[in-house]
């Protein structure tokens, strides 16, 4: 989207019955200034943005039921007349719109939370359709935040002369598009119809051979069927066609970006069987397992290949990724070049230095750690040693990206928890050298389909078994009212000489004034959100007054963070109250108990990583997930999955299945790369197909400029421009 603000075209232009996909939506009928601003809030500026804004749900009126016969606890679609519309304000910043809908058999109440504009869209005597889970309370059937559609209205809309006295839709299947204030699903359906009529038959950007190969709809048919389906099956086939377009564009963008990163750079052929590699392996306190050795050999093989390495090393907590990465660092040292290890937090960077540093020293490899707390004198010394080549390995955070950090010859970049860094940050680290091999690591196991959607052309190594699993962790769900049990477990553990964590979603009490996100099934735990500072102040003076407590948050100065963690590692602190700053990398084997407040506020990845902080030694760990998430809710199902399994790979699949969206286990594509149509769970086959097609296309036409693929290249650039910013497409 190149425009930043909407400009309204003259009326004579807006009533034109023909327009192109790149035209502003203001050329369409019915789009006045207010509607244009409302569409802009949905990210819709052009006609193509509108047509690719696909419905997130369909109301199937062939299966609607009367109110009295709607089954409690089941999803249902009902229609009826609005008998009343009420606005309630139970507390500041909380608005609830409550409507009563009646039909010949009974009454149903529907409540909408934090959507005040609904009172302007639904009026008394309107005929509406509601779709959602049927509940029962106070003698009435109820729905909470259901999908709704105004089928006919009793009140004209002064903002839109065409709305007055709409007639009920005769369609058996109605699309429900994402809505915002000023844009109801009903109005979206009308403007979508106008857009399809005004654009006519659009030119297909997908080569015809791919349409035939994958048995896809034409683009024009897909746009018609996804918005006004003849059947639910046709709607799904249309969505899959548009999803394939999106996924192929993403794969082409990822490959183009990688080709750009590596353009003009020759891979460096590392020495992989030198004395430092052998010395480091001998210095390890354990023998590499078959899986670890296999992963190490894959990495070393890449480091001598005629292609610059782009490898992702996946392994759950405790699988030994660190040892494998250390072998690669030693290979760079054997080659008389340099390696950089970049971690997302100073705590994790320090952890790597403490774990790997002594092994490197035993192998005769020089190394240093640089973070935000590094003194200026020490920083200058590190910079000098990097510049003259006397320093082989450096550990750090994004401080490594500073212009002051100049390497004599950087040939290996190791990036931990790569999804936490933006594309530009990873590229910036690689630009510190020529033909730099990239090894990305993650303790968050992700399905191959997600790896492809995040990284594109990436080789993957997986370590699935823990050589030293520790005593294990038991995960328990509890409601906040029963936290006494968790506190008792902490007291017992500390008295036995162990340590504990208390993890909160927020830092300060003032942050807890924020409202919950508008997501399905979100709940407010006990009417409040727990903050680390409040929990520390209250519990350290009451329940845990006889123990030594400390506080760790991301807002502390780097030096203070290091000091707090060092005291905890030395068992000078018995209970650590923190935020998710301890999520990855913190290794304190003596910690055995953890309580996570407002657990439903965290992603599965974060919770899985957090519980990996306990039970790492010879004593079993216990994690209490405190939440008021309702039984049957998505939040409760996700927490129950953690209670039932410790298999990270299985959790990744479960999370993908539950979410059905472009984010799983904490991974969210950044900036302009979010998937809007594709379902990473349902479209696994399309992701694989798009990846293979993208490889074949870029092999023939790397820059996507030939007659066969120029249109496709422009489409990919339009969707994922962040990856093409330096490729010169217009």
Regions found by a protein language model. Give the residues of each.
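N-terminal cationic and glycine-rich segments that engage phosphates or anionic surfaces
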Residues: 144-146, 153-154, 428-430, 440, ...
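Accessory helical-bundle/CTD segments and flexible terminal tails appended to RecA-like ATPase motors
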Residues: 566-589, 594, 612, 616-629, ...
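Inter-lobe coupling/hinge segments of SF2-like helicase ATPases
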Residues: 262, 294-297, 307-640, 703, ...
């Amino acid at each position: 989207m190149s425009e930043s603000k909407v400009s309204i075209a003259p009326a004579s232009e807006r009533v034109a019955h023909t327009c192109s996909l790149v035209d502003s939506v203001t050329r369409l009928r019915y789009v006045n200034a207010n509607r244009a601003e409302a569409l802009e809030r949905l990210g819709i500026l052009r006609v193509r943005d509108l047509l690719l804004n696909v419905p997130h749900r369909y109301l199937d009126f062939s299966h609607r039921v009367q109110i009295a016969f709607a089954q409690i606890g089941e999803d249902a679609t009902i229609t009826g007349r609005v008998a009343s519309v009420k606005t309630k304000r139970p507390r500041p910043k909380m608005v609830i719109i409550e409507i009563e809908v009646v039909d010949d058999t009974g009454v149903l109440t529907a409540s909408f939370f934090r959507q005040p504009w609904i009172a302007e869209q639904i009026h008394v005597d309107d005929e509406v359709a509601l779709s959602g889970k049927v509940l029962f309370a106070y003698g009435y059937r109820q729905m909470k935040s259901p999908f709704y559609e105004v089928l006919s209205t009793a009140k004209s809309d002064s903002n839109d002369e065409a709305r007055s006295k709409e007639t009920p839709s005769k369609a058996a299947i109605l699309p429900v598009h994402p809505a915002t204030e000023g844009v109801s699903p009903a109005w979206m359906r009308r403007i979508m119809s106008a857009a399809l009529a005004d654009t006519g038959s659009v030119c297909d950007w997908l080569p015809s051979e791919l349409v035939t190969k994958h048995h896809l709809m034409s683009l024009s048919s897909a746009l018609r069927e996804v918005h006004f389906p003849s059947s639910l099956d046709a709607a799904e086939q249309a969505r899959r066609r548009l999803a394939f377009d999106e996924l192929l564009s993403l794969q082409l963008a990822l490959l183009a970006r990688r080709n750009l990163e590596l353009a003009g750079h020759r891979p460096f052929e590392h020495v992989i069987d030198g004395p430092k590699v052998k010395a480091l392996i001998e210095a390890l306190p354990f023998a590499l397992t078959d899986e670890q050795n296999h992963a190490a050999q894959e990495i070393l093989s890449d480091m001598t290949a005629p292609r610059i390495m782009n490898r992702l090393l996946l392994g759950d907590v405790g699988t030994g990724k660190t040892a494998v990465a250390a072998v690669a660092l030693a290979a760079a040292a054997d080659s008389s070049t340099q390696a950089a290890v970049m971690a997302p937090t100073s705590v994790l960077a320090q952890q790597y230095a403490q774990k790997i540093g002594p092994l490197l020293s035993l192998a005769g490899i020089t190394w240093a750690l640089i973070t935000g707390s590094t003194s200026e004198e020490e920083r200058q010394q590190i910079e000098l040693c990097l510049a003259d080549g006397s320093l082989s390995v450096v550990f750090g955070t994004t401080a490594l990206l500073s212009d002051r950090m100049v390497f004599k010859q950087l040939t290996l970049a190791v990036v931990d928890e790569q999804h936490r860094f933006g594309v530009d940050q990873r590229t910036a680290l690689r630009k510190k050298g020529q033909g730099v091999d990239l090894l990305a690591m993650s303790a968050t196991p992700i399905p191959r389909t997600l790896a492809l959607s995040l990284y594109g052309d990436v080789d993957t190594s997986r370590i699935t078994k823990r050589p030293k699993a520790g005593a294990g962790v038991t995960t328990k769900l509890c409601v906040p009212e029963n936290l006494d049990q968790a506190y008792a477990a902490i007291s017992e553990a500390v008295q036995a000489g162990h340590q504990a964590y208390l993890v909160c979603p927020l830092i300060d009490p003032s942050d807890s004034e924020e409202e919950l996100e508008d997501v399905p099934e979100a709940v407010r735990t006990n009417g409040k959100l727990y903050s680390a500072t409040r929990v520390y102040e209250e519990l350290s003076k009451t329940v845990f007054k006889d123990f030594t407590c400390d506080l760790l948050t991301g807002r502390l100065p780097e030096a203070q963070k290091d000091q707090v963690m060092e005291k905890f590692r030395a068992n000078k602190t018995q209970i650590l109250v923190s935020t998710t700053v301890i999520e990855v990398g913190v290794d304190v084997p003596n910690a055995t108990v953890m309580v996570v407040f407002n657990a439903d506020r965290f992603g599965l990845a974060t919770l899985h990583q957090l519980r990996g902080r306990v039970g790492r030694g010879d004593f079993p760990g216990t994690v209490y997930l405190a939440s008021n998430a309702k039984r049957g809710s998505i939040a409760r199902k996700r927490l129950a999955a953690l209670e039932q399994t410790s298999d990270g790979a299985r959790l990744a699949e479960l999370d993908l299945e539950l979410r059905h969206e472009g984010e799983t286990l904490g991974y969210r594509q950044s900036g302009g790369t979010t998937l809007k149509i594709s379902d990473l769970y349902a479209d696994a086959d399309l992701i694989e197909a798009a990846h293979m097609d993208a490889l074949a296309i870029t092999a023939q036409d790397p820059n996507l400029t030939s007659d066969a693929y120029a249109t496709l290249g422009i489409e990919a650039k339009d969707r994922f421009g962040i990856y093409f910013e330096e490729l010169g497409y217009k």
